[in-house]
C-alpha cells in the first residue's frame, strides 16, 4: 500500500464535489492512504472534503488559482510532507499543466489520460488507451525514477458510480494543514516572469453537466448544418452534455469548448450519441473509450459505424425527434 496525494486545483463553491473529483478520491483509496492538496482555501476544503478516508488536506494561505506557479509549490511541498508514492489528478488542462511542471521539478514520470490505476507489488500501474483508442496499454514508473512519486491524470467516468459510493464515507471532519508557498499571483508565476494574468471572466454557468465529466454526451458534426436544436432537445431529455466535431466548431456553430477529439477534449461517458459526424480518426480519439456509442449518419459507409455499438442510417433531423418522442413516452 502507498500514500496517494489527490490534487484539486479548485473546489466547487457550493461544497459539493463533482463526480469526477469523487472518482479520484475513490481511486486513491484503492491504492492506500488518501491525502489531498488543493488550491482552494482551507474553509472551502473543510466544507467539500468531509470524507473519512482522507487523512490530511494540504492548502496554501488562501485561494491559489491556476495557472499560478504557487500551485506547483504547494504540490511539491505536499508530496514531501505526505511521502506520497503517487499523485492523482483529473485529465484536464489546468491539472495536467501543474503536474507536468511538478514532474520537471521532481525529475519523475507523468502518465496522462489514464482510465485505471492499481498497485502491482510495489509498483503503481496505470491503464490507458493509446493510438486514438485503438489499443489499451499499461505503464508504470521506470526503474531510473525509483523512489520518486508517479504522477497520473485520470479521465472522468473511469470508475463506476457504485464503486465510488462504496469507497467514500461522507460526514467526517477533514484535517486541514496549511503549507508555506509563494504568495499567490504576486509571488508565484508572475514573480518568475512566466505568466501574467491580465483578466479573469467568470463563464456563464450551464444547467448541463460538464462535458468532460458527463455520463451522457450528445455530439453533432457537419451533418447538423448549423442547427443544434434537435441535439439540445435530446440532451435535455437525457441530462446530457453537448459535444461537437471540429468541423462544427470551426464553422462557428458551437463554441470550441465543445470540441471532442484529438485537438479537443477526451470524454468517456456511459453513453455517447454521435449525430452527423463521419467519425474520422481525430474525432474518434476523443470518444472511443465511451461505454456505449450510438451513431446516426446518412452515409452507411461512415467510419463512425466501425466503432458504434448501435448504428442508425438516416437523417438526424428525422431520427432524433423520434428518439425524443419515444423517451418522453417512456418517461410519461
Across the structure, where does each feature detected by a protein language model lie?
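N-terminal glycine-rich FAD/FM-binding segment characteristic of electron-transfer flavoproteins
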Residues: 1-332
Amino acid at each position: 500500500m502507498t500514500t496517494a496525494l489527490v490534487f484539486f486545483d479548485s473546489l466547487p463553491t457550493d461544497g459539493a464535489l463533482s463526480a469526477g473529483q469523487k472518482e479520484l478520491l475513490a481511486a486513491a483509496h484503492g491504492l492506500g492512504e488518501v491525502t489531498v492538496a488543493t488550491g482552494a482555501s482551507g474553509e472551502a476544503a473543510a466544507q467539500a472534503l468531509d470524507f473519512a478516508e482522507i487523512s490530511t488536506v494540504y492548502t496554501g494561505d488562501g485561494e491559489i488559482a491556476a495557472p499560478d506557479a504557487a500551485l506547483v509549490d504547494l504540490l511539491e511541498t505536499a508530496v514531501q510532507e505526505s511521502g506520497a508514492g503517487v499523485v492523482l489528478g483529473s485529465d484536464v488542462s489546468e491539472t495536467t499543466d501543474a503536474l507536468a511542471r511538478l514532474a520537471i521539478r521532481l525529475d519523475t514520470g507523468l502518465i496522462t489520460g489514464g482510465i485505471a490505476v492499481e498497485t502491482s507489488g510495489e509498483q503503481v500501474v496505470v491503464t490507458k488507451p493509446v493510438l486514438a483508442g485503438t489499443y489499451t496499454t499499461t505503464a508504470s514508473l521506470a526503474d531510473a525514477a525509483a523512489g520518486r512519486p508517479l504522477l497520473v491524470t485520470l479521465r472522468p467516468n473511469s470508475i463506476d458510480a457504485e464503486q465510488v459510493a462504496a469507497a467514500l464515507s461522507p460526514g467526517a471532519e477533514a484535517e486541514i494543514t496549511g503549507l508555506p508557498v509563494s504568495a499567490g499571483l504576486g509571488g508565484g508565476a508572475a514573480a518568475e516572469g512566466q505568466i501574467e494574468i491580465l483578466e479573469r471572466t467568470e463563464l456563464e454557468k450551464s444547467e448541463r453537466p460538464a462535458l468532460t465529466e458527463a455520463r451522457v454526451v450528445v455530439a453533432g458534426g457537419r451533418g447538423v448544418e448549423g442547427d443544434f436544436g434537435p441535439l439540445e432537445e435530446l440532451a435535455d431529455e437525457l441530462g446530457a452534455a453537448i459535444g461537437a466535431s471540429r468541423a462544427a466548431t470551426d464553422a462557428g456553430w458551437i463554441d470550441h469548448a465543445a470540441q471532442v477529439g484529438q485537438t479537443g477534449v477526451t470524454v468517456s461517458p456511459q453513453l455517447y450519441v454521435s449525430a452527423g459526424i463521419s467519425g474520422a480518426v481525430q474525432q474518434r480519439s476523443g470518444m472511443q473509450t465511451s461505454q456505449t456509442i450510438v451513431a446516426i449518419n446518412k452515409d452507411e459507409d461512415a467510419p463512425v459505424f466501425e466503432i458504434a455499438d448501435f448504428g442508425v442510417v438516416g437523417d438526424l433531423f428525422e431520427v432524433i425527434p423520434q428518439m425524443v418522442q419515444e423517451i418522453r413516452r417512456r418517461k410519461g
